[in-house]
Amino acid sequence: YGASTRNAGFACFGSISELLTDLKSHSENDIFDLVEKRWKGLARLRQIIGDQSLDYEPFGGYEIFTSADKLLSDECYEKLNYFNSELHRITGKKNVYGDASTKIKEFGFSNIDRMLINNGEGQIDTGKMMKALLEKCRNVGIEILNGVDVTKIENENKFCRIDFNNGFSILSKKVLIAVNGFA
C-alpha cells in the first residue's frame, strides 16, 4: 500500500472520484478497509518518524473538475455525505471531504468549474523520510542493502546464508525480503 520514495510526497488515501471508481470493481468493505490501512499507515509513519523529520504538512488534497467532468463532479458532490460518514468512522474527522470551489481563483486555476478538498491528506518529504528510517534502522543494528542481486538464501545452522551474484556471501540471524512496485 505504498509508493515509490521518488514520488511527489503525497500523503494521501483517496479522492472521492478515485473511491467511486474503485467501488465499481470492489466491495465497499474492501475499499474502506484499504482506506483505513492507508490512513493508519500514514498515522504510524508519523508516529515512528515524527512530523518534523517527515516535513509533514497537512495541506489537504484537492480534486479539480472541468466542465467536461460535469457528470463525475455531480456524482462526487452527491456522495459527499456518504463518504464523509465512512471516513469519519475511519479517521475520526467529521468532514474529511468538502467543497473548495471558492479557492479556484486563489489558486490561479482557469477552466476549472468545481473543486473538492480532502482535509485528511497532506505532503511529506520522502527524502527526509528515508533518511530518518535508515537512521532508525542503523541505530538498532539493521543493515539495509539496496541494489544487490541475491542468488540464494538458505538456512545454515542458526543463521541464513545470503549469496550474491558477485560471489559475496553473508550470514545473518534474520532476513527481510522487500520489493517495491518496480521490482
For the regions a language model picked out, list residue spans one by one:
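Helical element adjacent to the flavin cofactor pocket in flavoenzyme catalytic cores
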Residues: 109-174, 178
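Flavin (FAD/FMN) cofactor-binding and adjacent substrate-gating region
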Residues: 17-23, 52-59, 66-132, 157
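A non-catalytic, amphipathic alpha-helix used as a structural packing/dimerization or gating element
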Residues: 29, 33-47, 82, 132
